[in-house]
Amino acid sequence: MDKLFNFDLSNRSQLSQELLNLGISNFNDALIYIQNLPYGRNSNRSDYSLILKEQKGTCSTKHAFLAALAKQEGKSEIKLYVGIYKMYEKNTPGVSGVLEKWQLPYVPEAHCYLKINDTIVDVTRNNNSNISFKSSLLFEEEILSHQIGDYKVMLHQTFLKSWLTSDAILYDFKTLWQIREACIRSLSK
C-alpha cells in the first residue's frame, strides 16, 4: 500500500481503540491489516465494525470501517465512495464463468472504495485490477459509512433497472440480480 496519507491513531475513538489493541498504531498499518483480511460477507452487511470480530469483509464493510475510522480521527481528506462499474473478468477475476453462461459481457456492480485527496484507494483489489476498475466506472457518489446497507443496495438496483432498459438487455431485473449474486458468490471461492 502506498503511503499516500498517514496519521497516528489516537485512543479517543472506539475503532482506534480496537486497532490499537491489535498492535496497529497508524492509518497505513490499518489499511494493510484490513486489506489482508479475506473477502467475505459479514453477518450484517451494514455493520462495518464486524470486520475485526469476523476477520473478513467486503468492499463495503472494509472501506466503511476505514472511512469511519478517519472521520472519528478528524481526517476529512478520506472519503467513502460507491461506484457502479462494468464487472467482467479482466477487472474482477473469477466472474467469467457466470457471465459466459448468461452471455453477458459485463454486469454493472456497485463497489465501495476510498478517495484520499481525490486518489482512489481500494483495499479489496490489487493494483493491476485497480486500473481496470477506474476505467470501467459508470457512476460514482460519495456516501457515509452508515449508507453501505440499504442505501447502497437501492442505488445499485435503481441503476440496474435503468441499465436494463437503456441497453436492451434480454433479462428481467430479478434474473439480472440473480446473475449478479452468482458473480459475487464466485468471488468467495
Would you name each region that the model predicts?
Residues 29, 65-68, 109:
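Short Gly/charged-rich anion-binding patches and loops
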